[in-house]
Amino acid sequence: MLRTILGSKIHRATVTQADLDYVGSITIDADLVNAAGLIEGEKVAVVDITNGARIETYVITGDAGTGSICINGAAAHLINPGDLVIIMSYLQATDAEARAYQPNIVHVDADNRIVALGNDAGEPIPGSSLLSSRSL
């Protein structure tokens, strides 16, 4: 039996562009793609913190150092520039692999620059006002 678990997360990224006239997908700055361990074409879930929208799409790697997070295609009706999003990938693993796996967590600032890397999906950026989901 395989379990589906969190593979990686880019936490609280700011959407920089939304383009209806594109075939589909999400374009993500190459620095963030690499830090999260994502690959071109990989399926991701995008959760909009601002309005609650949730979509599934695939990754297009954008130019490094730009901070770009661009929602392409029909999803641009749901997610807008300036919205805060969480981008998550999932992987399938055996029970033993799943219990040992540590996801790649990428925390970013308002300009989508990496401010912290980690492996605990429930912990906020150290020093932020966000609450840990482990303290609930």
Swiss-Prot record:
SUPFAM superfamilies: ADC-like (SSF50692)
EC number(s) per entry: 4.1.1.11
Gene Ontology terms, MF aspect: aspartate 1-decarboxylase activity
InterPro entries named in the record: Asp_de-COase-like_dom_sf (IPR009010), Asp_decarbox (IPR003190)
Active site: 25 (schiff-base intermediate with substrate), 58 (proton donor)
Sites of Pyruvic acid (Ser) modification: 25
Cellular component GO terms held in the UniProt record: cytosol
Modifications after synthesis and translation: Is synthesized initially as an inactive proenzyme, which is activated by self-cleavage at a specific serine bond to produce a beta-subunit with a hydroxyl group at its C-terminus and an alpha-subunit with a pyruvoyl group at its N-terminus.
Transmembrane segments: none
Function: Catalyzes the pyruvoyl-dependent decarboxylation of aspartate to produce beta-alanine.
Protein name in UniProt: Aspartate 1-decarboxylase
Source organism: Corynebacterium efficiens (strain DSM 44549 / YS-314 / AJ 12310 / JCM 11189 / NBRC 100395)
Organism taxonomic ancestry: Bacteria, Bacillati, Actinomycetota, Actinomycetes, Mycobacteriales
Gene name, Swiss-Prot/TrEMBL: panD
